[in-house]
Each structure stands twice: as C-alpha cells, then as structure tokens.
Amino acid sequence: MKKTIKFLTALFSSASLLMSVPALAEYRTFDDGNITYGIFQAKPEEVQLHWKDAEGKDYQSLTRLKNALEPSYNVKMIMNAGIYSMNNTTAGLWIEHGKELNALNTKSGKGNFHVQPNGVFAIAKNKPYILTTSAYQKSKLKPDFALQSGPMLIIHGKINPQFRASLESYHKRNAVCLTKQNELLFLMTIKGEP
C-alpha cells in the first residue's frame, strides 16, 4: 500500500517553480492585484525533503523526483526549496530523515541567502518550526527534516525590516509559514507581476 505524501520539497538547479497542483481541499489560490498566489496547507507528517537519489545523485527536476517517489507514495504536490550554489549544493542546512547532508551556514556574504536574518524550516517529531538561523543554532532541536534558506520575510508577525518598497525582484517565489494556530502553509507565486 502506498503512503500518501501531500507535500514534498526538493532542491534543484532551477529557480522556477515547476509543479502541477490538483484541485485539493488543502490547496487554494487568491489574487492580489495582478498577482495570483497558491496556498497549500499541509500536515507536518506529510512533508518530506528530497535532494539526492539512492545513488547520491541530485534529482535535477521535479518530474524525476515525482517518478522516483510514485512507486511508494501518492504524491500530491512538489515544489522547489532552499537556495543552492552553482554545483547544486545547498547553501545552508539540509537534513533528510534525521541525517544532516549539509551544515548550518552562518557566514556573511552577498545574495538573497545572506539577507539577514535568514532562517531554518524544520520538522521534528511531526511538529513544524520556523526559526532564525541564530535561534536554530542555539536550540537543541533534532529535526527529522530541515532546510536553511533566506531571507525570512516575516519575523514574529512583522515584515523583515531589510525589505523596502524600493526593492524590485519580480521572480516567482515560494515560502513556508506558520499561522498563529501553528498551521503549516506553503505559498507560491503562480502568475503575474506587481
């Protein structure tokens, strides 16, 4: 019997969001001006991260990952996750099934990953967490799955002050968030520009 996974994330060499989402109760869209966003509500126990296959090779595409997983899982949604280098190595922390594949990155530098504070999304014992990198570093959390990315958009209910109205980056983006009720939501730009 196949296990159902309603949300999978993967690290790929393409920044574009490549996914096909069926009409699910957990998925909805909303429009804000000229932009359409998708929101997917997931249960933490249904979320997994996948970077490399059994031979240690990067999946390279969402289709390849989906094909690899479908014999064992009913895949409901896949999206890219994290920030990575040109050689397909994640820029920061990456943990799959409790095994650390890449260490936490606390270095300063240029680019989106280093806009501070950046953060860590983690699932430990089926509970989701979103922490700043420094808070994660101080925590005793032992996640089953975790990835470090950046920058954090909202911190404790307030927009990250590093973002200014004059910043212009109209690339399609995706994000993970927790509601006040600790519901896990994944958001993505579907179409449009401001």
Segments and roles (model prediction):
Residues 21-112:
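Zymogen propeptides
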